[in-house]
Amino acid sequence: MPASSGQQASAIEAKGFPNLPRVHWTERYFRLVWGAVGIVGCLLLWQLGSSTGVFDPLFVSSPLEVLRTAVLLLPSPEFLGHLFITSQCLFLGLSIALVVGVLVGLPIGWFPRLNATFEPVIAAVYGVPYIAFLPVIIMWTGIGMTSRVIIVFWSALFPLIINSIQGARGVDDNFLRVGRSFSATNFQMFLTITLPSSVPYILAGLRTSIGRAIVGVVVAEFFMSSKGLGYFINLKANALEMAPAFVAIVLLALFGIALVSLVTYIENRFCNW
């Protein structure tokens, strides 16, 4: 006698899906320690190059000089204003890119006709350097906060779209067959199977997008702003005041490390399936 739906559900629940091995806390600690070793090693090499004259002090400040300058610069209201403008622009553009990238990419990956229609368009646009769109964006929106957010958004968008497409296309067929066996609609399977299965792909795309977004905000502030860390770096570098410029560069690097570490933590904490 064939098993009822309730019995099938109980059997599946009792058996469970195979679990992927979790990342043990010792492995995370190992990665953290060696990551710190890598950063410290780079700083030591930087200081050694500055001390031995390999790096011209006119163009490359030493880490110690950058640290001394940072202690004086960070409490400055003017510098904090630049930092706030860049942070605001970066997080706005990146957040909008995340939402739009997922909302566009998942349906394209889920529906074969949409995939066949839009995949060549995405590949063509993605192949164009996003800096090439800078004059067009300036013509459309002028020079201001809106144009800078659009540059950050455009810089970060396509890795999220592409990874969302791959996530939707890479769903295990066994999961879909289980959903169909319980008469789940396409929309229900999309919400309960495709979307959760795509989260690791989306987070991988977000890690790539973070670096592109930071580059985008700096380039936008180079050409389209009188505020922000990008403007500050350009201003100080043109005046050959390299220590303050390197303070801003290090802060941007710390932004990237912090955001990527946050995404990695979320992935390790919630995506171990």
Describe the role of every protein-language-model region.
Residues 92-122:
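Transmembrane-helix boundary motif in ABC transporter permease subunits
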Residues 123-159, 166-167:
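Generic hydrophobic transmembrane alpha-helix motif, especially the helices
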Residues 150, 154, 186-220, 246-247, ...:
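Transmembrane alpha-helices
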Residues 1-40, 261-273:
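Transmembrane alpha-helical segments of polytopic membrane transport and secretion proteins
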Residues 16-28, 51-96:
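Periplasmic/extracellular loop-to-transmembrane helix junction in inner-membrane transport proteins
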Residues 230-265:
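Hydrophobic alpha-helical transmembrane segments of polytopic membrane proteins
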